[in-house]
C-alpha cells in the first residue's frame, strides 16, 4: 500500500504545528505561530485561546485520520514527521491543565509520589497512533518536564521586560537546548554533563532561577504504578557555600567517614551523595570556594566521581551542577583566586541575570508588576489599596537604582507596609580618614581583637585590592578574610 501524503488543505496547519510543537515558549515565534493557528492574537493567560488552539489541532487530526486513528508511519517520510508532531501536540494539550494540577498537588506533598493516572490514557493515545509503548511512556515524562519548566520559569521569575524575556529563553534552552530535536535524540539523558553558571548581582534572583532549573529536570513515568518515578522536589539539593568554614566545606560537599576529623562520630553523606539521577545540585556563592576545594570539584565535573573526606572509596556522581556567583567572579579569575580550568568546566552555559534597574529602565511598568507580586507573596492577598500605597511611597525615590535588586525591593515593601516610608541604605561618608581613625583607636586601646583583625584586613584590602594578597599577609584563609571584611 503506497504511503500517504498530507492533503493540500491541511498542509499549512501541519507545517505550523510542526514548527510550534517544541518551540521555546518564551520566544516570540511561538506566539506568532499560535496566533496563526487560531486566527487571532494568542494570549497564554486566556483559556479560551488555549481551547481554540486545541480544537483547531484536534480537528485536523480527526480529519486526517481514520476512525480516530492517525498513524504517522503510514505517511511518506517528508510528511510523517509533521504528522508525528501533530499527534504529540494534541496529546500534550489534552493533559496540559491536568499536569498543572498535578504539579500543584505535588508541591503540597513534598517527599511523596502523587499518582498521575492520566498518563496511562496519554500512552494509549500515542500507541494507537503509531508510537511504541516505550516511546509513549518516555513522552509522558517529557510532557511533564516541559510543563514544569514553563510553570516554574514563568512563576518564579516575574517580569515581561525584554531582558527578562531573553533571560527566560536562556533558562529554557538550558533545560532543552536551543533545538529540542537534539534533546530528544541524544541529549535528554546526558544533561548532567552540562553544568551552568548563573551570574548576577546580589538579590537579582539567582536562587529563584536555580530552583526553576532544579525543579524542571526529567522525571520518568512509571506506567505500572501510574505515577512519576519520584517527587521533582527531591531532585534538587542546594547549599550556600559561603556559610561553611573551610574545614567544614568539603565535608558538606563530599561527605566524610567516621573518624575523619575531630567530631566526625559517624559517616555523613554530603551534598553530592544526596543528589539522585536526573537531579541537580545548586552551589550558591561558588566564587567563595577555596582553591583546594576547586580542584576536587573540577575532578567531580570531569570524572563524575569523588571521595568522602577521610575515605578511599570512589563514589559516582549522577546529577547536574548549577552554580551561582556575583559578577566579581571575573575579578577572582583575574586575581588567580578562581581556577580557569574549573571555570571553563563549570560553564557549559553562563547565564547573566538582569538587574532590577535594567528591567525598570526597559519597561517602567515592571516595577508595579513586581510590587503586586511581592505584596501577594508577603501578605497572601492581592490588595489594590496596598499596592497603591506602596507605589506612592516608591514614587518619591527619584533616581534610586536598586543596588539590592529584587531582594531590596521586597524589603522596601515590608518597611512601607510597617511604617509607610522607605529609607534606602546609603554608603557612609568617607570624609574621615579611615587609616588615621584606625590608628587612633589602636593608640587608645579601644579595639577588641575582632575589630583589630577586621580593621587591619580592610586596610590591607584597600591597599592590595584582592582577597588573595590579604590572605597571604595575614596568614589566614580567604574565607576568613571575607568574614573580617564583612565586619569592617
Q: PLM features: residue spans?
A:
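Bacterial C-terminal helix-turn-helix
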Residues: 1-85, 99, 105, 411, ...
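Interdomain "pre-motor" coupling segment immediately N-terminal to P-loop NTPase/helicase cores
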Residues: 96-158, 166
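Pre-Walker A (pre-P-loop) alpha-helix and adjacent loop at the N terminus of AAA/AAA+ ATPase modules
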Residues: 151-194
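Nucleotide-binding/hydrolysis machinery
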Residues: 162, 292-295, 310-320, 328-435
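Conserved RecA-like P-loop NTPase ATPase core
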Residues: 171, 198, 204, 239, ...
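Short helix/loop segment immediately N-terminal to the Walker
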Residues: 181-193, 223-229, 269, 311, ...
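Walker A/P-loop nucleotide-binding motif
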Residues: 189-209
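Conserved AAA+ P-loop NTPase core
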Residues: 207-319, 330-347, 360-362
Amino acid at each position: 500500500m503506497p504511503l500517504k501524503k498530507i492533503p493540500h488543505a491541511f498542509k499549512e496547519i501541519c507545517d505550523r504545528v510542526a514548527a510550534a510543537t517544541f518551540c521555546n515558549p518564551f520566544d516570540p515565534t511561538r506566539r506568532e505561530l499560535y496566533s496563526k493557528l487560531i486566527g487571532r492574537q494568542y494570549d497564554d493567560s486566556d483559556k479560551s485561546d488555549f481551547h481554540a488552539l486545541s480544537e483547531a489541532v484536534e480537528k485536523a487530526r480527526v480529519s486526517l485520520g481514520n476512525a480516530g486513528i492517525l498513524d504517522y508511519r503510514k505517511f511518506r517520510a517528508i510528511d510523517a514527521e509533521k504528522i508525528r508532531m501533530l499527534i504529540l501536540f494534541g496529546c500534550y494539550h489534552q493533559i496540559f491543565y491536568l499536569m498543572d494540577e498535578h504539579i500543584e498537588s505535588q508541591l503540597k506533598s513534598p517527599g511523596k509520589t502523587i499518582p498521575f493516572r492520566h498518563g496511562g490514557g496519554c500512552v494509549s493515545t500515542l500507541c494507537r497512533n503509531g508510537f511504541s509503548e516505550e516511546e509513549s511512556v518516555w513522552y509522558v515524562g517529557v510532557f511533564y518536564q516541559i510543563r514544569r519548566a514553563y510553570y516554574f520559569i514563568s512563576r518564579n521569575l516575574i517580569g515581561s521586560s525584554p531582558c527578562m524575556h531573553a533571560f527566560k529563553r536562556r533558562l529554557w534552552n538550558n533545560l532543552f537546548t536551543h533545538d529540542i530535536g537534539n534533546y530528544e535524540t541524544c541529549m535528554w539523558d546526558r544533561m548532567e554533563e552540562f553544568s551552568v553558571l548563573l551570574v548576577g548581582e546580589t538579590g537579582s534572583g539567582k536562587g529563584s532561577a536555580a530552583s526553576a532549573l532544579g525543579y524542571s529536570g526529567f522525571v520518568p513515568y512509571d506506567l505500572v504504578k501510574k505515577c512519576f518515578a519520584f517527587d521533582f522536589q527531591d531532585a534538587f539539593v542546594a547549599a550556600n557555600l559561603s556559610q561553611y568554614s573551610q574545614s567544614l566545606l568539603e565535608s558538606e560537599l563530599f561527605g566524610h567517614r567516621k573518624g575523619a576529623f575531630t567530631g566526625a562520630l559517624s559517616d555523613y553523606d554530603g551534598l553530592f551523595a544526596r543528589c539522585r539521577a536526573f537531579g541537580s545540585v545548586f552551589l550558591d556563592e561558588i566564587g567563595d570556594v577555596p582553591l583546594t576545594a576547586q580542584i576536587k570539584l573540577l575532578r567531580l565535573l570531569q570524572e563524575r566521581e569523588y571521595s568522602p573526606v577521610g575515605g578511599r572509596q570512589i563514589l559516582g556522581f549522577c546529577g547536574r551542577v548549577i552554580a551561582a556567583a556575583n559578577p566579581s567572579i571575573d575579578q577572582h579569575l583575574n586575581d588567580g583566586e578562581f581556577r580557569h580550568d574549573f571555570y571553563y568546566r563549570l560553564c557549559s552555559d553562563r547565564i547573566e541575570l538582569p538587574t532590577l534597574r535594567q528591567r525598570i529602565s526597559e519597561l517602567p511598568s515592571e516595577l508595579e508588576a513586581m510590587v503586586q507580586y511581592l505584596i501577594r507573596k508577603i501578605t497572601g492577598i492581592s490588595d489594590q489599596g496596598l499596592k497603591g500605597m506602596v507605589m506612592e511611597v516608591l514614587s518619591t525615590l527619584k533616581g534610586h537604582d536598586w543596588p539590592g535588586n529584587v531582594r531590596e525591593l521586597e524589603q522596601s515593601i515590608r518597611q512601607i507596609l510597617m511604617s509607610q516610608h522607605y529609607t534606602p541604605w546609603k554608603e557612609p561618608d568617607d570624609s574621615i580618614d579611615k587609616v588615621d581613625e584606625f590608628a587612633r583607636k589602636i593608640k587608645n586601646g579601644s579595639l577588641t581583637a575582632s575589630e583589630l583583625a577586621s580593621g587591619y584586613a580592610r586596610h590591607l584590602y584597600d591597599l592590595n585590592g584582592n582577597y588573595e594578597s590579604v590572605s597571604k599577609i595575614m596568614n589566614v584563609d580567604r574565607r576568613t578574610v571575607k568574614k573580617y571584611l564583612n565586619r569592617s
